């Protein structure tokens, strides 16, 4: 019966469902996991990279983490070509705001603006929803550090810890149990690695299979967006007991 209502995004089913939006969410459920955790001194984003070939140059291939502006970054789960369009749109919106008002765009205002674009693609004929979910991490003078999650419907909300992509329900369950409001950035990194280790489909977690980024304030009170290198990731994995040092594994 659903086949009568799932060909267009503008038609509701008798149960009040938009099937094309639900199908877009299914596509995200098959993508690599992304997790965001808010701490008292920053925001941590971590994502699972789907390494499809050993020939892929992972050191130059960004798949999960993207910088939108100096004070905002995001993690992505879903169809990457869709994500690239929306990320470029967000970057332009942020730059236009800065040009007009001579100050960074508030994080929630940027998220809301992008979600308005996503919502439009669920309401007009001849379009399909963007098959991508975002975790936005940022800081502004109005609300400090913030973490937002948005889905293909254009809905968004502020979170203390959130997960999107494959096995997101299991990840959310662990986050709900182990998250602490007063956690430091280092503790948030440890929790993110723990969650990804328990929810990833692969047997072992290595630096080639993940991306880790942090948004925090420097001592001079400027916002810093830092993406960990593979070498730094390996050290973190060893430090938190996720993997063994190379000397021990050989």
UniProtKB/Swiss-Prot annotation:
Origin species: Arabidopsis thaliana (Mouse-ear cress)
SUPFAM superfamilies: N-terminal nucleophile aminohydrolases (Ntn hydrolases) (SSF56235)
Protein name: Proteasome subunit alpha type-4-A
Description of how the protein assembles with itself and partners: Component of the 20S core complex of the 26S proteasome. The 26S proteasome is composed of a core protease (CP), known as the 20S proteasome, capped at one or both ends by the 19S regulatory particle (RP/PA700). The 20S proteasome core is composed of 28 subunits that are arranged in four stacked rings, resulting in a barrel-shaped structure. The two end rings are each formed by seven alpha subunits, and the two central rings are each formed by seven beta subunits. The catalytic chamber with the active sites is on the inside of the barrel.
The entry's keywords: Cytoplasm, Isopeptide bond, Nucleus, Proteasome, Ubl conjugation
Cross-linked sites for Glycyl lysine isopeptide (Lys-Gly) (interchain with G-Cter in ubiquitin): 40, 64
Tissue expression remark: Ubiquitous low levels, higher expression in siliques and flowers.
Function as written in the Swiss-Prot or TrEMBL entry: The proteasome is a multicatalytic proteinase complex which is characterized by its ability to cleave peptides with Arg, Phe, Tyr, Leu, and Glu adjacent to the leaving group at neutral or slightly basic pH. The proteasome has an ATP-dependent proteolytic activity.
Compartmental location: Cytoplasm; Nucleus
Family according to the record: Belongs to the peptidase T1A family.
Pfam families: Proteasome, Proteasome_A_N
Gene3D superfamilies for this protein: Glutamine Phosphoribosylpyrophosphate, subunit 1, domain 1 (3.60.20.10)
Signal sequence, start to end: none
């Amino acid at each position: 019966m659903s086949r009568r209502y799932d060909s267009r995004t503008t038609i509701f089913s008798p149960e009040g469902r938009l099937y094309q939006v639900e199908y877009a969410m299914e596509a995200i459920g098959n993508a690599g996991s992304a997790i965001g955790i808010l701490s008292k001194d920053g925001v941590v984003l971590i994502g699972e990279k789907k390494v499809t070939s050993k020939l892929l140059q992972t050191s130059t291939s960004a798949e999960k983490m993207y910088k939108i502006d100096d004070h905002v970054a995001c993690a992505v789960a879903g169809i990457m070509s869709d994500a690239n369009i929306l990320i470029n749109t967000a970057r332009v919106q942020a730059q236009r705001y800065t040009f007009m008002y001579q100050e960074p765009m508030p994080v929630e205002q940027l998220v809301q603006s992008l979600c308005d674009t996503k919502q439009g693609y669920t309401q007009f004929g001849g379009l399909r929803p963007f098959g991508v979910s975002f975790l936005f991490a940022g800081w502004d003078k109005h609300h400090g550090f913030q973490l937002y999650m948005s889905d293909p419907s254009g809905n968004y909300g502020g979170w203390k810890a959130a997960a999107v992509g494959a096995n997101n329900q299991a990840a959310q369950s662990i986050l709900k149990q182990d998250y602490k409001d007063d956690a430091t950035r280092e503790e948030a990194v440890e929790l993110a690695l723990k969650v990804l280790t328990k929810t990833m489909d692969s047997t072992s977690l290595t630096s080639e299979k993940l991306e880790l980024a942090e948004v925090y304030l420097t001592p001079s009170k400027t916002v810093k967006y830092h993406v960990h290198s593979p070498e730094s990731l390996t050290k973190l994995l060893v430090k938190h007991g996720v993997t063994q040092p190379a000397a021990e594994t050989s």
